[in-house]
């Protein structure tokens, strides 16, 4: 085993990387409230794992979406647990994100030189809200359908581009299969990818600049 480790160590300098990670200075004022961002990340990872598991059973069509969700909840092995954990972690992620934003704002973590860290955090907040909107529609029940109708109609109030945006969101003149397909693609591919990229940027900037001062 040591020979395998030595082989990788010679090429990748694993020990130097580990030393850099474990030797980072943690200020004495850091407390449990500084863990809210990490908890948000944990919730996101749980979402990815449980969401991936449900893609094996979910069918993104207006005729089969609701039935496939019912199958997950009633017949698939541990499907009810996986979907419940997905929903609970979604709620927890939103709550932890809101508390994290308040903590950062109250401690002045958005000030120079951490403006870009704050900007990436705001983008992550918007992505999280979009996760909620797109995920809410996927069961394609009455609540999900009318939620989509409401959300896709909101941009109509925007001057000049409002009508074009309304047609862009549902991907057709009315809410239907094209809308569900688009929301499913956003929820399972586009949003997770963007969130992962911005989370990486967010954490790298925190790593570089360190944690802001005490409350």
Curated annotation (Swiss-Prot):
Binding site for heme c: 35
Membrane topology: Multi-pass membrane protein
Any GO BP annotation: photosynthesis
Membrane-spanning ranges: 32-52, 90-110, 116-136, 186-206
Organism: Pisum sativum
Protein name in UniProt: Cytochrome b6
Additional detail: Heme 1 (or BH or b566) is high-potential and absorbs at about 566 nm, and heme 2 (or BL or b562) is low-potential and absorbs at about 562 nm.
GO cellular component entries: chloroplast thylakoid membrane
Cofactor note: Binds 2 heme b groups non-covalently with two histidine residues as axial ligands.
Record-linked PANTHER family: CYTOCHROME B
GO molecular function, one term: oxidoreductase activity
Function, as annotated: Component of the cytochrome b6-f complex, which mediates electron transfer between photosystem II (PSII) and photosystem I (PSI), cyclic electron flow around PSI, and state transitions.
Family: Belongs to the cytochrome b family. PetB subfamily.
Cofactor(s) for this UniProt protein: heme b; heme c
